[in-house]
Each structure stands twice: as C-alpha cells, then as structure tokens.
Amino acid sequence: MVRSGKNGDLHLKQIAYYKRTGEYHPTTLPSERRGIRRAAKKFVFKEKKLFYVGKDRKQNRLVIVSEEEKKKVLRECHENDSGAHHGISRTLTLVESNYYWTSVTNDVKQWVYACQHCQVAKNTVIVAPKQHLLKVENPWSLVTVDLMGPFHTSNRSHVYAVIMTDLFTKWIVILPLCDVSASEVSKAIINIFFLYGPPQKIIMDQRDEFIQQINIELYRLFGIKQIVISHTSGSVNPTESTPNTIKAFLSKHCADHPNNWDDHLSAVSFAFNVTHLEPTKNTPYFQMFSRNPYMPETSDSLHEVDGDNTSMFAKILDAIKEADKIMENKTTSLGQMENNNLDELNKSKIIVKKKPKQLNPFHLKVGHEVLRQRKNWWKDGRFQSEWVGPCVIDYITESGCAVLRDNTGVRLKRPIKMSHLKPYIRESSEQESLYLLQGSVVADHDYIGLPEIPVGAYQANILVEDATIGIVDNELLTSSKDRELLEYRNTKVSPLIDDHSSLEKQTFSLLDSSNQVLEYLS
C-alpha cells in the first residue's frame, strides 16, 4: 500500500532499488521501510525489468514508471486493430492483464474521458430508419414467393414446388421444381414473368445470401435489378402471405398422388383462383381480370368423362370446396367454443360485493368506553393482534380518528382509527362493584356529561328505579329462569336500599338535632 500523499512512481522506484541492491533508497523514510519490505515480496526482477507477481506469484505484469510509457500503454489498450475504441472497463482489463502501476485505474478513466473520438461517438445518436410497409393498391404489384417440399419424386423428377401469391387479388400460381437452387427458382419466376409480367417487388422468406443470388440470376435472365426483398425487412404485413389452406391442400394432394402430383399443379391453382372467396366476396380470378371465367352451366359435364369416370379437375375442384367447408366449419366451431368458454367463465365468476368501509361501525361517541386493537404484537413466536384497554374517547378529530385517555386519565399520543375500536362491555361483577363504589363511579363517569347531583340522591334514584322496574317486570315474567334472575337481582339490590334508607334517616336525625340547638341558642 502507498501511504496517502506519496508519489506512486517514487514508491515503485524505492521497491526496485530495494530489490536490486537489498538496501533502502535514500528517499525512504524510516517509517516506510517496513512497508517497502512487505511490498517487495510481490515483485521480481526478470531480464533487468521489474515485474509484479502478486501474493500468489502467478501474475506477470510489467511495472511502468515513466509517463511516456504509460501513455503508450494506454493508447495501445484503448484502441484495437480495427480502429474502434474500448470503454473504461475493457481498457482497464487489457492494461491490468500485462502492466502495473499504482494509479492505473484513475489514469484509464482520465484517458477515456479525454479521448476526443469517444466523446464524439458518445454524443452521436444513430437513428434507425423507419420501415414503411409497402402499400398494395393494384393487382400483381406485390407478390410473395414460397417454396414447398420436398415431396415424393414425380415421374418428371420434380421434388419441390414454388407458389407465387398476389397480395392484392390472392391470385396464385404453382410451378414444380427439380431443386431449390437459385438458378432453378429464378427460371420458374421468369416463366411467370412471361405470363403476367414482372411485379414491382417480390417478397421471399429466405436468407439474404439466397435472395442476393436470385437477384443476380433475374438480372442476368430478365435484366431487372433488386426486385426480390426479404420477408424479414418489415416491408409487408406477415399475415398477408400465402394462405395456409393452399399449403395444407397441396401437401395432402402431393401425398395422395406421389408419381404425378406435378401434372395437377395448374389445375390446383386454377381451382383455388375460381373458388377461394376473399373477404370482398370476389374470387381471385375476378379480382385479377375484373370478370368471372366461363364455366359449364352444369357440373355434369365436368363429372361425366368417358361414362363413369370423373375428370381430374372436377375431383380437385370438389376436394378444394370440401376443404373450404371443413375449414369454415372448424372456424365456426372454434368461435362457438370460445363463446361458450367465455359464457362459462362469466357464469363461474363469483361476484363479490365489497362492503363499504365503515369509519365508525359501532357509532362511538365522545365519552364512550372502548377497547383499541393492538396489531402486529409479537407473542408466542408469531405476530398477533389483541384488544387492550379500556380507554375513554376524549374527542374525535376531523379525519374521523379518536383521541383516547387511559384509566389514569393520561391522553394517548396518537389518534386511533374508529375502525380499530370497539365498545367495552363490563361484566356483571364489574357492574356490582360500580354500584358499591359510589365515589369511583362518579369519578369514572364524570366525562359522560351527566348532571351534577348529590351522590346519595343519584345513586338512590338509580337503585330505586331498578327496584321498581324489577317489581313491574315480575308481573310480566312467566318463565322460571326469568324469575330466578329477578330474585337474584332483588337480593342484591335490597341490602343497598336498606343501607340507603338508614343513611337518609341518619341525615334527617342530624338535621333535627341541629335545629334544636339553634332554637336553644336563640
């Protein structure tokens, strides 16, 4: 370690001097000698050059001292052979893999920050060109090319098929191929050019090298440049390609006729062009030529060939119509299944009506005794909630929270939500103690807002009213349990009434004696 404020180059010179001579450099302070000895263990001399090997002695990094050598190393590690510039992390990795000096990290950062080329490249934003979808506005202006196969080798040695689809009319042309080389595909495309003319663009879902070879062949054969583009260029909507129905039917037809499937490709394409309806309810033939083809009035002429034999085109036409019906039914059934599934999901959904949040569910008011909920209380190894109290509601804030006081009358620091409170219901034993402890009753219930009346009169009124209510209710009670409860209550109340009557008698006797004394004095 280099002490704070010490020059790193001087530190390395002192280590090199110590490793070479075994003595300390004249500039070495006595307090630095121990550090020089410990640091020297990580360096070795090789061919009169100092190398840093580290604690494990597995590294082999040349020690750089002079500023010129540092700049040379930084320039070599920051720029690669291709002329590109590395960032801080990569440059630091390259420097530390072969070279060593004490301030290597800071020097690399300053070098990269000061590099003019890096600053210009950092502030330059490369905006990718926007890819615009080609608009299909006219027939035979934008065509897709798909390759299918390999199929069973036909009698004419055809193994593959090429399908050209016009994206505007959905007109298709199918031709057989012996292989899928660029020259073979280009010859098939040229034959279609001679029938319908070249389109504006041809889209293929192939690799760029193959597309470039086809463009070269088309330029050699037809003299047109860069007409074929890649499907991945984003110039066309992926859904606007060869319909899957055609591919599926062609695969099945080639499997059913392994030897002569290539003889029927023109019939298959014509059958699709005259029957395959588009969303506009017009056939591709009508879209292409603005008219319908001439077809026999009855289908009998198509089916009756040499008596009982049926023409191949009629078979293909019927098969395509059947495939369209199957596809339509499948689409309809899938739509119905989706609708049924949605209906079942809607029926199975349980509509849970959330109760509105009640800010004061118990209709608590100022002066009520309540228990407050204490949540997240750690007890018995887990968090629990419990009700503590009782407390008294001192007042209610504007936000609907209650400020409480405990039994000692001390106000709690934080307001409590009304939803975290519930009424405190006293037990029977506590109610009896309230009747007996009259002074404490008044002290505890002074906050309720009762009128200030003498203790004896207030308590006597309560007891007398309770006793009269019990007597009246006794006439109405018929069940044995109610009578037992009333008798128990009367037994508890009657001694208190007697005590209260004796107390009143003593009070009146004291008043009489005081009157007599006043008369005597007068």
From Swiss-Prot:
Stored InterPro entries: Integrase_cat-core, Integrase_H2C2, Retrovirus_Pol_polyprotein, RNaseH-like_sf, RNaseH_sf
PANTHER family, per database record: PROTEIN CBG26694 (PTHR37984), PROTEIN NYNRIN-LIKE (PTHR37984:SF5)
Keywords per UniProt: Phosphoprotein
Name recorded for this polypeptide: Gypsy retrotransposon integrase-like protein 1
Annotated organism of origin: Pongo abelii (Sumatran orangutan)
A Gene Ontology biological process term: DNA integration
Record bears the keyword Ribosomal protein: no
Matches recorded under PROSITE patterns: INTEGRASE
Gene3D superfamilies: 1.10.340.70, Ribonuclease H-like superfamily/Ribonuclease H
Name of encoding gene: GIN1
Annotated Pfam families: Integrase_H2C2
Location of the Integrase catalytic domain: 135-292
Domain of life: Eukaryota
Phosphoserine PTM positions: S502
Record flagged with keyword Transport: no
GO molecular function, one term: nucleic acid binding
